[in-house]
């Protein structure tokens, strides 16, 4: 019997009861191996925010690792637009796949959560969000990092590092991502709370939006140095690429010699920069696990398991003390 027929039989009643937004209660796990033999694998659409960066390649590597380990359970169709501002292209990809009858479920990392929520409003197939939440009663689960909490942990670590570096006035300016993006907002909220709770001051009026790109982060950092010629204790960024760009831009400015540059993601290039003393720290996501666990959770629910509200893939604060260990681990994932 095809697995999609199994899905229809098992989920006809349970989906109606469990489609309670991405905030439903955690429920017992199903057996991830059930129904694997003698039936076709589930067809799952997985749409990334982009497929042009290391961060998303690691997520894809994790997803493909699960697929490779369980070829009888799932077959993936993974795609993504060229950049994290390619909104229309991603929406078109999602719309196309929603209209494709062969897919049994959809894993989506939305660039625009509200727009995607509207797109999935009429689907009767399982939808799960990864990396960024989709606020919709059709979204069964969120798989990823608690962005606010991870940023908060990183911010508190940055304040302690700034104190150790000799800063008395601990102010923080953020070089932010895309204004209005849910992930960017969550990270900013976490940075603000972490800095302020640890005794620093998050300068809300000085936030610089850089659309999650290194080029605009350079421009933002140049503006910060012009406005704050005596230096700033902490520069936090929405992602590692921007943090590396900001640190590089300030490298020859003696007023910023002891500035703590905090990134987010913990990607390989950032870990190498931290190990080499070119970046101070990063609030690292376990992005390989995001991909792996997203597919794992989708398969479990397609087999009749109750969806979990949140599958937390964890956070790691990367500093010079543990950067090399993470480099070795991540390099292995990309082989």
List each model region and its residues.
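Hinge/cleft segment of the Venus flytrap/periplasmic-binding protein
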Residues: 40, 175-179, 183, 198, ...
């Amino acid at each position: 019997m095809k697995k999609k027929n199994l899905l229809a039989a098992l989920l006809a009643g349970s989906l109606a009861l469990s489609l309670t937004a991405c905030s439903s209660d955690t429920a017992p796990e199903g057996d991830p191996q059930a129904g694997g033999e003698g039936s076709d694998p589930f067809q799952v659409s997985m749409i990334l925010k982009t497929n042009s960066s290391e961060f998303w390649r690691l997520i894809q590597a994790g997803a493909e690792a699960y697929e490779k380990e369980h070829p009888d359970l799932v077959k993936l169709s993974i795609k993504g637009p060229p950049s994290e501002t390619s909104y229309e292209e991603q929406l078109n990809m999602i719309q196309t796949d929603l209209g494709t009858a062969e897919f049994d479920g959809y894993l989506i990392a939305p660039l625009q959560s509200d727009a995607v929520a509207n797109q999935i409003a009429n689907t009767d197939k399982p939808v799960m969000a990864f990396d960024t939440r989709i606020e919709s009663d059709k979204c069964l689960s969120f798989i990823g990092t608690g962005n606010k909490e991870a940023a908060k942990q990183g911010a508190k670590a940055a304040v302690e590092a700034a104190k150790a570096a000799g800063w008395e006035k601990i102010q923080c300016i953020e070089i932010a991502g895309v204004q209005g993006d849910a992930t960017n907002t969550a990270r900013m909220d976490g940075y603000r709370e972490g800095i302020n709770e640890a005794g620093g001051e998050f300068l809300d009026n000085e936030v610089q939006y850089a659309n999650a790109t290194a080029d605009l982060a350079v421009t933002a950092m140049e503006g910060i140095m012009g406005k704050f010629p005596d230096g700033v204790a902490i520069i936090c960024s929405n992602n590692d690429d921007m943090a590396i760009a900001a640190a590089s831009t300030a490298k020859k400015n003696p007023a910023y010699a002891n500035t703590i540059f905090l990134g987010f993601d913990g990607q390989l290039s950032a870990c190498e920069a931290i190990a080499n003393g070119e970046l101070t720290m990063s609030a690292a996501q376990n992005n390989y696990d995001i991909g792996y666990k997203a597919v794992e959770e989708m398969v479990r629910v397609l087999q009749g398991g109750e969806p979990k509200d949140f599958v937390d893939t964890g956070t790691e604060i990367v500093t010079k003390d543990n950067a090399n260990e993470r480099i070795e681990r991540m390099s292995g994932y990309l082989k």
